[in-house]
């Protein structure tokens, strides 16, 4: 039995578990699990159901066990701008509001009252997009 490595890719509309292995110097990739993904809406707020996402991650790992291919390591790739706030006991505070939610509308102007757009870019190198984390954080501050 060879060594297996699991990559979990969670995108905005689907997620998948890909097992990788080496055989005769070649990389083999096998999709072992796929699931639907998308934001939920509650009271006009778009958010990620992180509990469901966690359940999907576990389901894909169970699938690896079912087919007898236990990974030695796991890597997870997700979208890069959303976040959850945690309390001192690492419990999630509120919803994991998604980047497509409209709470960031106008938050660029609020951020630029603190730091200019040019200075922000010089410090981060991140292209301006209204869904970037800094605007989500400003929206949280304003709520």
Where are the language model's segments positioned?
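N-terminal glycine/serine-rich phosphate-binding loop of ATP-dependent small-molecule kinases
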Residues: 1-95, 122
């Amino acid at each position: 039995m060879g060594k297996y490595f699991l990559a979990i890719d969670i995108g905005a509309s689907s997620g998948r578990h890909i097992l990788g292995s080496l055989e005769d110097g070649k990389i083999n990739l096998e999709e072992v699990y796929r699931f639907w993904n998308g934001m939920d809406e509650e009271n006009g707020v778009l958010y990620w159901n992180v509990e469901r996402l966690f359940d999907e991650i576990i389901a894909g790992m169970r699938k690896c066990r079912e087919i007898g291919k236990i990974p030695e390591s796991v890597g997870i790739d997700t979208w890069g701008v959303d976040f959850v706030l945690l309390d001192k006991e690492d419990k999630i505070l509120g919803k994991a509001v998604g980047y497509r939610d409209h709470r960031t509308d106008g938050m660029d102007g609020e951020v630029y009252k603190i730091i200019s757009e040019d200075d922000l870019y010089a410090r981060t190198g991140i292209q301006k997009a209204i869904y970037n984390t800094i605007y989500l954080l400003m929206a949280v501050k304003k709520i």
